[in-house]
């Protein structure tokens, strides 16, 4: 007899963990685990939900594509859902996919359109009467981010379709990529001017398309490669193609580039031969790929097979195994994270893996070093797990010379010298000194990161400088900084310093309770749990007073999480931090986990505002967040009901329209002065 409560708890944990990794991968471009590790978790959840249907949840990652839409860009619904793909990692799994089609269709399709599985950013470009009108990222599949202005700068994207029989409306799906050679040149330019150096072409492509400043996007070597369509509206009402291979030919006629090496395969065996051929040649291709996508070629068969909640039943991604190369393990250094965990990091002789130079790889914990039998000076095999995260696979014992040395895990913290503690129920070694400089530094970095308050302009580099200089010892100290304070640090000129301070102020006045809970970095408390807590407690005072039993009655909170929350609030240093944050004005009081709280005494309370033009002190999204935090309602269209319009530089037709209606117009400085009233 199965233990349903136990399986229910496991399924809930898997859903939360998969959702967290989806956000890290799709939204933040900072994956923590490999594709293979993600797929192991995903398949476990699929198996649980299949064996016990009562565990099914419509919000489960198995029922959706993955990746919520970021707040910085406008959201828009897809006309037709943009699905993800199911994966296969072996010939047996490819055979099982074919067998499922045999069991579904009376006549089994034998032809498949195959092309490389590109490692870029999936999105949709939309054309009305042959003219490019808009672009959306895949987002969560149902809605995406509007990136029209950015995509207009992509040089190989046709702004007007060529050829004949152009549809009235055409939605083209594809991938934005950066070629390997272009990526190397981009990173060289970035490094030369002290800019961000990207980890891989996918991160560079995703970050470039999501830029609010399209002049930056225009300077990036982006390509759009089309692989399919969404909605198509034609004169005759019926598409003039009956196969996917015909569709690809039509897309090329209209002016789209397509993935390299695409071809029609006339049997499942030919598909597998193509997969093996492309796997052997992947290094010679101009773009990064991580597998092959095989699609049933016949469009009637595609319609008959249909879709699951997550993916088409007529297409499959055949993933390549991770590429492995040899290099030397030069050293192992131990880093201390914000929760005090000591993490060993392999220092490697630099080597190229899958087009990316790798010189470091996490070893996770002491047991991984022991289990793999690693010694300092070893020649090792290295791969990028899931073609993303560097990983030491194993030592090449046969190459040992006798000069290799064992690594001894430290018994004291490498940062503060405190004795290292290892709980019996954990694999991690921890520094439990709350005053440890590394713990403080990493906690502040997390506080302002995208996973915390998301303060633009306060990256790891500037936080490191502030902590090292003694200007900041806790997160609350950030809110005492001035523009002049920041201008003394590297990469902080007058404009960037002013923008960073404005971002801090926006975070202080606009943070939700849920966002602040995330920023505090309470162990085991992620975004979903933070939203749960913010829904059930009116503020941090109420949360602090809740005992373990009360916490256990909340959804998503088990004994381990409840104990971690109590441990955080029982720590005197944390209580002092909360009081300092309260004194700085960062104390959301509304139990709304999804929207900003409204501060009392605001001059903007109840007003309807519109922003137009380019703002200098902050981004448009930050201004919107600050206005809403002050109780205003921000809209995007000009109307007589507007109370005020905030006009930045180069304001255009909306400003003209507002003036013709006699609306009250203010500039960015006046808007900032209205916000200052919040602190009086």
Curated annotation (Swiss-Prot):
GO molecular function terms noted in the UniProt entry: DNA binding; DNA ligase (NAD+) activity; metal ion binding
Domain BRCT: 599-680
Listed Pfam families: BRCT (PF00533), DNA_ligase_aden (PF01653), DNA_ligase_OB (PF03120), DNA_ligase_ZBD (PF03119), HHH_2 (PF12826), Nlig-Ia (PF22745)
UniProt-listed SUPFAM superfamilies: BRCT domain, DNA ligase/mRNA capping enzyme, catalytic domain, Nucleic acid-binding proteins, RuvA domain 2-like
Residues given in the record as Zn(2+) binding sites: 413, 416, 431, 436
UniProt xrefs under CDD domains: BRCT_DNA_ligase_like, LIGANc
One GO process term, biological-process aspect: DNA replication
Cofactor(s) recorded in Swiss-Prot or TrEMBL: Mg(2+); Mn(2+)
UniProt xrefs under SMART domains: BRCT, HhH1, LIGANc
Family, per entry: Belongs to the NAD-dependent DNA ligase family. LigA subfamily.
Name recorded for this polypeptide: DNA ligase 1
Organism: Nitratidesulfovibrio vulgaris (strain DP4)
């Amino acid at each position: 007899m199965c233990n349903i409560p136990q399986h229910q708890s496991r399924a809930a944990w898997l859903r939360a963990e998969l959702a967290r990794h989806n956000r890290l991968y799709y939204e933040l471009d900072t994956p923590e685990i490999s594709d293979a590790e993600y797929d192991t978790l995903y398949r476990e959840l699929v198996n649980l939900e299949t064996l016990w249907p009562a565990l099914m949840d419509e919000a489960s990652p198995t029922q959706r594509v993955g990746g919520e839409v970021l707040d910085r860009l406008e959201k828009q619904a897809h006309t037709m859902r943009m699905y993800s793909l199911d994966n296969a990692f072996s010939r047996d799994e490819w055979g099982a996919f074919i067998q499922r089609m045999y069991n579904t269709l009376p006549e089994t399709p034998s032809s498949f359109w195959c092309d490389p599985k590109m490692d870029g950013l999936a999105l949709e470009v939309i054309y009305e009467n042959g003219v490019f009108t808009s672009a959306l990222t895949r987002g969560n599949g149902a809605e995406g981010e509007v990136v029209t202005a950015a995509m207009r700068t992509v040089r190989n994207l046709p702004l007007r379709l060529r050829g004949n029989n152009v549809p009235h409306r055409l939605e083209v799906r594809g991938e934005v990529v950066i070629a390997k050679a272009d990526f190397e040149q981009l990173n060289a330019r970035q490094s030369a001017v002290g800019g961000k150096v990207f980890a891989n072409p996918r991160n560079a492509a995703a970050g470039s398309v999501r830029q609010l400043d399209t002049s930056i996007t225009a300077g990036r070597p982006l390509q759009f490669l089309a692989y399919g369509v969404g909605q198509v509206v034609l004169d005759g009402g019926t598409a003039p193609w009956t196969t996917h291979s015909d569709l690809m030919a039509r897309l090329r006629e209209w002016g789209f580039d397509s993935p390299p090496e695409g071809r029609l395969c006339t049997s499942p065996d030919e598909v597998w031969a193509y997969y093996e051929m492309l796997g052997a040649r992947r290094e010679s291709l101009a773009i990064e790929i991580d597998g092959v996508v095989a699609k049933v070629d016949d469009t009637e068969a595609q319609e008959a097979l249909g879709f699951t909640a997550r993916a088409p039943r007529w297409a499959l991604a055949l993933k390549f195994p991770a590429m492995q190369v040899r290099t030397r393990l030069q050293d192992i250094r131990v880093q201390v994270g914000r929760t005090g965990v000591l993490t060993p990091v392999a220092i490697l002789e630099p080597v190229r893996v899958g087009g990316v130079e790798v010189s470091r790889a996490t070893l996770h914990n002491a047991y991984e070093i022991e289990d793999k039998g690693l010694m300092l000076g070893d020649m090792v095999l290295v791969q990028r797990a899931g073609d993303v995260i560097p990983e030491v696979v194993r030592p090449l014992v046969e190459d040992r010379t006798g000069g290799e040395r064992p690594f001894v895990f430290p018994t004291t913290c490498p940062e503060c010298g405190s004795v290292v503690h290892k709980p019996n129920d954990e694999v991690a070694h921890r520094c439990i000194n709350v005053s440890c400089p590394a713990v403080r530094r990493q906690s502040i970095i997390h506080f302002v990161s995208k996973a915390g308050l998301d303060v633009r302009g306060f990256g790891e580099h500037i936080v490191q400088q502030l902590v090292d200089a003694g200007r900041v010892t806790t997160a609350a100290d950030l809110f005492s900084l001035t523009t002049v304070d920041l201008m003394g640090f590297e990469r902080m000129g007058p404009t960037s310093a002013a923008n960073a301070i404005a971002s801090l102020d926006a975070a202080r006045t606009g943070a939700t309770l849920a966002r602040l809970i995330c920023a505090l970095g309470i162990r085991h408390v992620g975004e979903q749990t933070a939203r749960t807590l913010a829904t059930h407690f009116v503020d941090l005072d109420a949360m602090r007073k809740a005992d373990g039993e009360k916490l256990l009655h909340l959804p998503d909170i088990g004994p381990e999480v409840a104990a971690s929350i109590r441990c955080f609030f029982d720590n005197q240093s944390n209580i002092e931090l909360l009081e300092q944050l309260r004194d700085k004005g960062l104390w959301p009081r509304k139990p709304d986990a999804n929207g900003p709280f409204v501060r009392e005494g605001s001059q903007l309370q109840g007003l309807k505002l519109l922003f137009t033009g380019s703002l200098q002190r902050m981004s448009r999204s930050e201004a919107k967040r600050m206005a809403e935090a002050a109780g205003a309602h921000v809209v995007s269209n000009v109307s007589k009901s507007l109370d005020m319009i905030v006009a930045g530089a180069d304001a255009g037709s909306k400003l003209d329209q507002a003036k013709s209606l006699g609306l009250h117009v203010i500039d960015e400085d006046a808007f900032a002065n209205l916000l200052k009233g919040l602190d009086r």
